[in-house]
Structures are given as C-alpha cells and as structure tokens.
Curated annotation (Swiss-Prot):
TM ranges: 149-165
Side Extracellular, residues: 166-237
Topology in the lipid bilayer: Single-pass membrane protein
Biased amino acid composition, Basic residues: 214-231
UniProt name for this protein: Protein VP5
Subcellular location field: Host membrane
Signal peptide residue numbers: none
Superkingdom of the organism of origin: Viruses
Organism: Drosophila x virus (isolate Chung/1996) (DXV)
Start-end of Basic and acidic residues biased regions: 85-97, 116-130
Gene giving rise to this polypeptide: VP5
Keywords: Host membrane, Membrane, Transmembrane, Transmembrane helix
Cytoplasmic side: 1-148
Location of the region described as Disordered in the Swiss-Prot/TrEMBL record: 84-237
Amino acid sequence: MLSIIRRKTRIVDITKQGNGNVPPACHLCSRRLTKEWSFGEGTICSFHRIRCRVQCGRSFWHQPETPIDGLSWDSTTWELTRISSSKDPDISGQKDKRYGRRKEKNPKTDPPALDSRVREHEPIHEHEPIPGRVGPADTKQRCKANLRGDSGFVSIGRSNHPKLSREDCHNTRVPPGTQGVRGGNVQLDKPRERPVSYQHGSKKRSEHRNPVSRSHRRKKAKTRTKTSKLGKSRDIC
C-alpha cells in the first residue's frame, strides 16, 4: 500500500517538475508521449493538440475561452501560443491540404474557345462533284465504259492492255458478240488443259530412267564383288 502511494507521489512530482529521463506529462490527461508541445507555462500532449485543432478549426492557434474535453481554460496559465517549429508550417485559417489539392487538380473551367485559324468549311452537297476528286458516279461511268469498250473513257493510270481494251494479241479489235471471247483472247468455253500428276516431270527424265529398282542394283553389285574375289583367290592357288 505504501509503495503504491509513493509511486503515485513520485508520478505527481515528475508531472509537476519533470525529469531528465522521463518527459513531462500533459497537464490535462497526464499522458507521457515522446513528443509534446509547450503552451505557455505547461505542456500539452499530441491528443489534446489534435482536439484543439479540430474544435477551433484552425491550425496552431486556440482561443482561451474554448474548452477542451470539457475542461475550462485559465487564461493566465493556458494562454496557447504559436508553436515555433519548422516541420509544422502555419496553415491557419485554411482547410485540409488534401481537399485543396484535389480541387486544384480538377478545376471546373469552361472549354477553351476554338482557334481562329480553324475555319468552318462550307457544306458540300452530296451529289455535287468535288474538284480534283473522282466521285462514285464518275467511277461507275468509267467501269461501264471499259466494259463496253468505249475509247472516250480512259482509265487513270492504266495502259491499253489487250485484255482490258478488248483487243487480241495482234492489236485487232474483237467484236463484242463473239462466243467464247471475253475481254480479249480469254476463252471461257474451252476448259483449260491441266497437266496430270505424272506429267509434271520433264519427258527426258522419264525416257532415260532405268526401270530396275535400286535394291535390285545393290544385289547385283554385291554378287559381282563376291565372284571377283573368288576368282582372284583361285588364280593365286
């Protein structure tokens, strides 16, 4: 029991005077924190400092008549002064930084006006031909003229090919009513002769090819070598 009383008295003494090893406690809640802020004659903990900021709505200033945690202020003792700290800049009378940054990033501004150099083009009618361009109607006329064989319309960028100009290889005009002729010498009535699979190779190879298989040749070569060796051995004996 005595030890508890002594310990409490020691805590009270440390709270009043302070110790070199133990930081002085808050005068409002007796909390000992590693970081405390001096306001006038006493100290205040970080919790009450935050409460002070929240209630008064300002950064580091507090009015003496505003109570904290329901405790009345004594103007002579608890006249809060401005904290002289480089880490905590003075943002008094301002809102939280985060909301200010969001508003700066996404400002509500009117869309920029159109550049004076961008001029509005006059509306062009759909069927009105544009100078310098080939319209769809013009291309259809050219295609029909090419099919008819009219010389009045010449296709752009194409030479007078015999098949395109309905002429044969000898530059003679092919009458349009002839059967089997379409766009020149191409005859569609006669089917094109295709080579059979065994005719793909050259004829010379097939003529001079030896009908004897390779395996048969090897057998013949082996028998020749055996007979020659036997003959030599008989001669020596």
